[in-house]
Structure formats: structure tokens, C-alpha cells
Amino acid sequence: MLEGVRVLDFSRLLPGAYCTLLLADLGADVIKVEQAGRGDPLRAMPGGPVYFDALHRGKRSVALRFKTPAGHAAIRKLVAASDVLVEGFRPGVMEKMGLGYDDLRRHNPRLVYCAITGYSSNGPLRDRAGHDLNYLALAGPLSLMPKTAQGTPAIPSIQAADLGGAVTAAMAILAALFEREHTSHGRRLEVPMFDVVQSWIGHWFAGARAHVAGLDLTGGLPCYHVYRVQDGFLTVAALETPFWLTFCDVIGRPDLGPRQADSSAIDEVQAILAPRTRDQWVAAFAGRDACVEPCLSLEEVLAWGVPQGAPVLLAGDRPRASGPAPSLGEHTLTVLEECGLSPAEIAAATRAAPEEAR
């Protein structure tokens, strides 16, 4: 679907990487632009090489000297030959390097430039450093998490703000590419992760203003709960009444039907489910619409045999960028030659000065 679309990824760590992975899975040629001698910090973090490989499969890597005239010249030629640029710096960083949207669109008016930021460049927090946990905390979603034994909100096991920002950015990029077909012009996009996660709980804010409590989807309902069984856990998400009635029928307690939202029923359901194994309950619910599934470990998911990793189906196919993740600068020569740089220009743009390698 995106064959022929070239994406330059200047970002680091998770948000930009997952955004451009989604685009790569749809056929885009994603070029990770890294600083010569350094590369993405993820490469050097504990477990980083494994995570880097998962996030950058099928992409290409170019290593350049960002802070030199030769490096800038190479970047301008890359931009002139590309469709999309993704970056994840704090507002103003790319501009200080002479690589902001206003600088680059002079070399490519059709460029779609997407900045994935922590906080809006137009807001009071624009210069504040932050990561996923900070955005979840300030925007409100962290306060909605279940509490730990110490009384603190539980930290989600996945980086929800990072991934939400990535998906939102990919959606915005696709919309801008569609718009470009009609206008022949690109545009600058900004995706502040703080704003993304706050938008997820708009209905909670509406309820708070109206003093209306919404559904407790954090384990306070018997119909939406994680139950312990003999050898693991079983998830029940029977929010709609027909699903809940089916659930009650399978466990042999149709009398619990009227108590779908009665928290006192949780212990009764738990006592029924606990003696049997997870597989026994899976077999009992087979073919019954009750929204009941086992809670699988990562190892069990890998062994399950269900195709993984491609969030979009195209007429039954699972598009997926193929090939291993690139080593630092692995495709520099090839990509820069494709963009028309001479051997001398390539050499000048790629040699890492001692102060840049530190």
C-alpha cells in the first residue's frame, strides 16, 4: 500500500520506532537516520539489541554527522528525495540544528513532517523532559490504575503513551499523505503524547464534571474481572448481558444473572472457578459466547501458533516488513548514492568527529 513512499526516521527509542514500523509493515521504505558514532541509545540499553531488532526489522540505517555542513547537505538531499520525516525531540531541537520543518520544506514542499513530542510546542510544558510514565501521570490515566499493596498506582507493563503516540502519528501521517494527493503540498504534524493519552479519558472527564460514575473496569465488577484458577488466571469480560448470562450458565450458576454489576458476587465466582484448571475452563467455554479467555504468558503466546505482529489485515494477508534490523549505518552508502551524493560528499557527511563519538 505504501510502496514507493520513503520515510526518514530521526527519532530515538520507542514512539517513533513503532510509528515507522507500522509504516514499514504497510510497504514504506523506512530509513533510520542516526548520528555517526552514536546511533540510537536503544542499541546500548540493557536488552536493547533485542528490542531494537524487533522495532526496526525491515528498515535501513544511515549514519551521518548531524552537526556539520557536510552532514546537513546530505540530510537536505535525503529530504528532497523523501516523502515523510518523523522525529521525536523536544520542541525546538530540530530547529536549532537547522532541520526544522520551515528549513526543510524549502528543499521539499511535499514533505510530510511529523514531530512526536512529550508536550505541545504551544503549551507551557513544551520544554519539560519526560517519558511515558510522566505523560500518563500528568494526563490522568495513571490515577485510574489499580493500586499496589503500597497504595501507589500500578505502572502499566507496556508503554501506553509511547505506543499511543506512535499509532496516532502513523494515522496522522497517512491522512497527510492522502491530503497531499489533492494539494501537492506536505504539512507539519505534531503529536504530543500527553495530549494523546488525555484524549483517551475524555469520557472520564465528562463523567467527573457531571458527577456520574462510569463502569468500574479495573476489577470491581464480577463480569469484568481476572479470576485465579488452579494453575493460572482466567479473564472474564462479559459486559453485555447476553454474554454474562451465558457465563453464568456455563459455571452452573444462572442465579447470578441479576448480579452482573454486584461486586459481592466476585468472591462467589472465584470460589467456583478456583478448583479447576485453566484448560478445563477453556474447554468448558469452547463454542460459547461469553468473552472468556485464558491469561497467557509471553512464552505461551509464542508457542500458541497464532500469527503475530501485524496489526492490519489486507484481504486476508498480514503485511510485514521483512529482513533483520540494520546495524548502525549499514545502508549509508547505498541510500546516499540513491540520493545523488558523490563519494567525497558521502565521506565528509559520515565521518564521526571525536567530539561527536563521545
Predicted regions and their residues:
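Active-site-adjacent capping/gating segments
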Residues: 43-53, 214, 295-335
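Glycine-rich beta-alpha junction loops
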Residues: 37, 118-120, 193-198, 231, ...
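N-terminal helix-loop segment corresponding to the beta1-alpha1 unit
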Residues: 1-185, 327, 333-358
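A short glycine-threonine-serine/GTX helix/turn-capping micro-motif
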Residues: 154-164, 215, 221-224, 233-235, ...
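Short, well-structured beta-strand/strand-turn elements
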Residues: 30-33, 286-300, 342-347
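Substrate-binding/catalytic subdomain of NAD(P)-dependent oxidoreductase enzymes
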Residues: 177-214
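Short linear loop/turn motifs
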Residues: 257-271, 295-304, 344-358
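Aromatic-enriched alpha-helical interface/lid elements that frame and gate functional surfaces
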Residues: 211, 218-288, 292
